[in-house]
A protein has these predicted regions:
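Short Pro-Gly-centered beta-turn/loop motif in secreted/extracellular proteins
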Residues: 83-96, 100-106
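Structured interaction patches on ligand/partner-binding surfaces of diverse proteins
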Residues: 103-151
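Short, ordered, surface-exposed loop/turn motifs in non-cytosolic proteins
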Residues: 44-70
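Predominantly extracellular/luminal cell-surface or secreted proteins
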Residues: 40, 54-62, 98-104
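Bacterial Sec-dependent N-terminal signal peptides
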Residues: 16-42, 158-162
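Short, low-complexity, Pro/Ser/Thr/Gly-rich segments in the mature regions of secreted, periplasmic
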Residues: 148-162
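Short, acidic Ser/Thr/Gly-rich low-complexity loop/linker segments typical of extracellular
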Residues: 64-82
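Sec-dependent bacterial lipoprotein signal peptides
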Residues: 1-22
Length: 162
């Protein structure tokens, strides 16, 4: 009888150790960033019938190529004047600009075929070079930004061709 008690006690202790060792540790450090985005659209009824609207994230500004991350927005996503998005799995890095823009389908010139609807900060007068950069890191892995946007189809003048 003594052996049965010892084996039962040993089995119970082994089971408890197994259960404790399988506990999920939710304090694992983050390995990528998450950006929660709210786009407040002043005039959602002015959504263009043609062209493409983008929400884009750039690491550098002015951009020197394609955005780091970009999604196409649809007018059906607007709810009470707001579009909510989440960009996940972002590199731990510094980002220069979060923007919303409309691409003119009739203008193939990338230097002047987009109308900026809004950015997370910065001004059109400085062509958004004064936007405040933001950084993702293990200590700062989730951010929320708000973009105030005005739907428009006014693109900048194209530079003269030589």
């Amino acid at each position: 009888m003594n052996i049965i008690k010892k084996l039962s006690l040993l089995s119970l202790i082994a089971s408890m150790l197994f259960l404790v060792s399988c506990d999920d540790d939710s304090s694992d450090p983050a390995t990528s960033g998450t950006l929660n985005i709210s786009i407040n659209l002043t005039n959602p009824d002015s959504w263009p019938a043609e062209g493409t609207v983008f929400c884009s994230l750039d690491k550098t500004w002015p951009p020197s190529g394609a955005p780091y991350k970009s999604v196409v927005l649809q007018s059906a996503q607007v709810s009470n004047g707001t579009i909510s998005l989440v960009f996940e799995d972002l590199d731990f890095d510094t980002y220069a600009l979060l923007s919303v823009s409309w691409l003119d389908p009739n203008n193939p010139n990338p230097a002047c075929n987009q109308a900026v609807w809004g950015t997370h900060s910065g001004s059109i007068q400085a062509f958004y070079a004064d936007a405040v950069p933001f950084t993702f890191s293990a200590e700062n892995s989730e951010l929320s930004l708000v973009v105030g946007a005005v739907a428009n189809t006014v693109t900048p003048d194209c530079p003269p061709t030589g």
